[in-house]
Amino acid sequence: MKRLKYRVTKDHQASFAYAMISAEGDEVSVGREDQEMPGWFWCRDSKGVEMWVPSSYIDIEGSRGKFNQNYNSMELNAKVGDFVQFLGEALGWVECLNHEWRYGWIPKDKLTKIQKNASQIPDPLS
């Protein structure tokens, strides 16, 4: 099975050292929407963890939201030249794994899709 891979074109340092990990059905308090990245909302879970959540992951009613799928907000630190395995995408960010099986999100504008010879890039899922 061919899997989509990306190469890191700009270094990325995670903005947060922690993550919000939520399961489908979990509820959150929904705060402000990010003005620079529309569709991302500042949310607080039942444990008090606050983090940005893409609107595609939560059903929002007023100031409350419910996850419509599992979500892990962990960002992935990456250096130029690293390769990552695509897992998903939401509002300008790519969910991925690196060659060390580290999981996280990287802004899509810091990545370029591998078009040729992607099969020669190590695949953390194989």
Task: Identify the residue ranges that each predicted region occupies.
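Src homology 3 (SH3)-mediated interaction modules
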Residues: 1-126
